[in-house]
Swiss-Prot record:
Gene3D superfamilies (alphabetical): HUPs
Binding site for ATP: 25-30
Name by which UniProt lists this protein: tRNA(Ile)-lysidine synthase
Localization (cell): Cytoplasm
UniProt GO cellular component terms: cytoplasm
Length: 326
């Protein structure tokens, strides 16, 4: 089995003798994940817990939750759920934040209930196809290297809690085959059919065209993102050292004079990583290019507003960042 082989290669991905919390929507990817984990749970001595987020986005949301709960109980899997207030999930970004917030709270609760089987892993059903969609979306928006290496196999989201995506070695066609082979129920979310949403348009219209031209294009795009990930980690390490070298007199500043002596591409890498370390969550490659151009040598003092009420300003000697809400 492919997942079992991957777990043997990286034993820290899903440690044995622990509680793992699965985010299950009821769609084909998450149900395939649940089946694979159930089949391996005895071997790895896992306590498997299912969490379902009810966004109340469509008329059958309650029905989906009830039927999924019943299926889990029949298969002797613990089931947990939360219902969202409409304001909490007004858009995709808010909905994602709501899910992760509740998943983290549930993981902490499970750990407190069983200290011998702590819940240190939260699992989602993201596949190689999801990763390919994200790469295409970020490329179209304009991104730096970090934007091409999103949806990592594992990342820390809270102290002692990692978000893990075991299905990145599968594409969506393969998760559908798993569901068919094991006769798994699949609950369709109508919101996934709305092509007015960017990701759905890529999923329904763009990726199928790419796959028809180059069979398996989604898996290869995801593979490129995976290879770039290690390169990106090396770049982050370099940027950390470079930021220390360019540190200004104040903690929220960089020396503009030191930046002048570096190449254009290195300045952009430093600026991109510096902004992220200072708390700027969303910055595009075009914005980095604009900042880099405006703070270049012989350019007059000025300022730029960024997402999240952040303000970048500069004078002759330094570049500063501040949050307008503070």
């Amino acid at each position: 089995m492919r997942l079992h082989k991957r777990l043997k290669q990286n034993k820290s991905l899903l440690p044995s003798n622990s509680t793992i919390l699965l985010a299950i929507s009821g769609g084909q990817d998450s149900m395939a994940l649940l089946k694979l984990i159930i089949d391996l749970k005895r071997l790895h001595q896992w306590q498997v817990e299912v969490w379902h987020g009810n966004h109340q986005w469509h008329a059958k949301s309650e029905e989906t939750e009830d039927e999924l709960k019943l299926w889990c109980l029949k298969n002797q899997i613990s089931f947990h759920s939360n219902k969202a207030d409409k304001k909490e999930v007004a858009n995709e970004e808010k909905a994602r934040d709501w899910r992760y917030k509740n998943l983290i709270m549930k993981a902490k609760f499970l750990s407190s209930k069983n200290i011998h089987f702590p819940c240190t892993r939260i699992l989602t059903g993201h596949t190689a196809t999801d990763r390919a969609e994200t790469v295409i979306m970020n490329l179209a928006r304009g991104t730096d290297l970090t934007g091409l290496t999103t949806l990592k196999e594992q990342r820390t989201i809270e102290n002692n809690i990692d978000l893990t995506r075991p299905l990145l070695i599968f594409n969506r066609n393969e998760t559908l085959e798993i569901c068919k082979d094991f006769n798994l129920p699949i609950w369709i979310d109508p919101s996934n059919e709305n092509i007015n949403l960017t990701r759905n348009k890529i999923r329904k219209e763009i990726l199928p065209i790419l796959n028809s031209i180059y069979k398996g294009a989604d898996s290869r795009i995801a593979s490129v993102a995976n290879r770039l990930e290690s390169y990106n980690e090396d770049q982050k390490l370099f940027a950390k050292i470079a930021i220390q070298f360019c540190q200004g007199e104040k903690i929220n500043s960089l020396s503009r004079i030191k930046l002048f002596g570096l190449t254009n591409s290195i300045r952009q890498i430093i600026l991109s990583n510096w902004l992220k370390t200072m708390g700027v969550k969303r910055v595009t490659a075009l914005q980095i290019e604009e900042i880099n151009t405006k703070v270049s040598q012989r350019k007059p003092p000025g300022s730029i507003h960024l997402h999240g009420d952040f303000l970048i300003r500069w004078n002759k000697e330094a570049i500063y960042i501040s949050n307008k809400t503070n």
